[in-house]
């Protein structure tokens, strides 16, 4: 499992999600607004909006917040957000891809560059690291939907490419273009997914020691703390021994 997924699991176990709930809702709302603005405000006619709402519901975002975010898209004074991707290197030469939705490119670029620099990394040009990642669909389910065999069978039938199952749940990988079709097929067997989204999946991972892992996790944490940053992906790998120490 790539470093960022491991990091998410650590943060979940430490209960950090509760302290960043408001910021998470803000990011989910921004994605809903952008999705509604770039397509139809009806989720039945707009796949991106449908998935944005589904992901928000999976995080227990209140219905009123979701409806307000959709309505905001049609407001005359609603902000125009640009989708921007930043790429760079963290400690140890680890590749990092950052996705943002911003109403001020200069502000966001300056903030992201500063975070990389303070972590001992460097912000690069667009395309400087994304070539070592694949754009794929990621569909996640909670562990209670079934055992690994059941989920694997459903995933193969739906046309997915890979499945990772653990005590934390099931992660299903599929082609980016097939994400909507695969998620609908899985929903018919396993029910509604916890999340469905496009991600940058590393083609290969870089093993890091405990010191580097801590530095990289701090880098990711600081990037995700920025209001404009929506997602962060990286290609580092942490051993089970180090993971256990960081999870303690």
Curated annotation (Swiss-Prot):
Localization in the cell: Cytoplasm
Record carries keyword Cytoplasm: yes
GO MF annotation list: DNA binding
Pfam families assigned to the protein according to its UniProt record, in alphabetical order: TACO1_YebC_N, Transcrip_reg
Matching SUPFAM superfamilies: YebC-like (SSF75625)
GO biological process: regulation of DNA-templated transcription
GO cellular component: cytosol
Region (Disordered): 1-21
Entry keywords, A to Z: Cytoplasm, DNA-binding, Transcription, Transcription regulation
Family according to the record: Belongs to the TACO1 family.
Name listed for the protein in its UniProt record: Probable transcriptional regulatory protein Atu3727
Species this chain originates from: Agrobacterium fabrum (strain C58 / ATCC 33970) (Agrobacterium tumefaciens (strain C58))
UniProt lineage: Bacteria, Pseudomonadati, Pseudomonadota, Alphaproteobacteria, Hyphomicrobiales
